[in-house]
Amino acid sequence: MTKKAKTAMTDTSGAKQVQSVPAVSDVAPVNRTYKSTLFIMLFQDKNNLLELYNAVSGKHYTDPEILEINTLENAIYMTVKNDISFLIDGRLSLYEHQSTYNPNLPLRFLIYIAKLYSRMTRNANLYGTKVIRIPPPEFLIFYNGKEELPERAVLNLSDMYEKEDPHAGLQLSAVMLNISGENNQKLKEACRTLKDYAIYTDKVRRYAEELELADAVERAIRECMEEGVLKDFLEKHRAEAKEMSIFEYDQEKHMRQEREEAWEDGRAAGVNEGIQLAKQILQLSHQGESPAEIARKCNITLEQVKKILE
């Protein structure tokens, strides 16, 4: 029997009616051409996901069945699935993993949440006079890349508008949490799976500096299993985890190289643009913005900001 998600509707008399709409997870087709990142492989398990939600929210839930995972298939990613969405506490949570900084995530989240709400209300009367109740969303990004970013940053949709408008009718804010290295230790201590994941990915990245990538991943897996890090998961999914880790690292390296090449091309082709960018960075610095915030707003790395400010 198909599960149903409940949408409450209130009429003008105050009486509530409940309309059933199909849960997203029941109606979305599965497309196996997309690979899940290691992060998603871990946290699509309800026990791990509940552990992460408790760590983020400060809650202490113990029953993973209160989670309703409703991740969209074939949403807006190209070849790698790095997001998960779920309902709990009357809220709609969207978690995404990133190994490279992406300033366009607020817009991507907007597109994603619109598709989710569309699915959730597919049988509701959007043209009626009764209010259709929808769960409020929250957007979290778990970042574990090489770029030096703050432990916590807020990415706003309004920062993407061509024209600054304090009265813009649409806003969306996403919180980015840096889980690389020593960042957000308290959060990682509260979620063992997240801590182990961060340890594993840090090992892969470190060993890849001196070994062939496949050898670096194999060494990281072997050490983690010996140290009890993701041991059960790696015992069950060793081959798949190795394949995904190699693919992810190659993707991360490729994207980083593309950004570096674009930066160099821009410098060679547009000296004037570089001057204007430097002026913008200096102006933001004089206004009290931190180097990390300047990097985010200008869509460049923290190292590039620091070089200009020196």
Which residue ranges define each predicted feature?
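Elongated, amphipathic alpha-helical interaction scaffolds
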Residues: 1-310
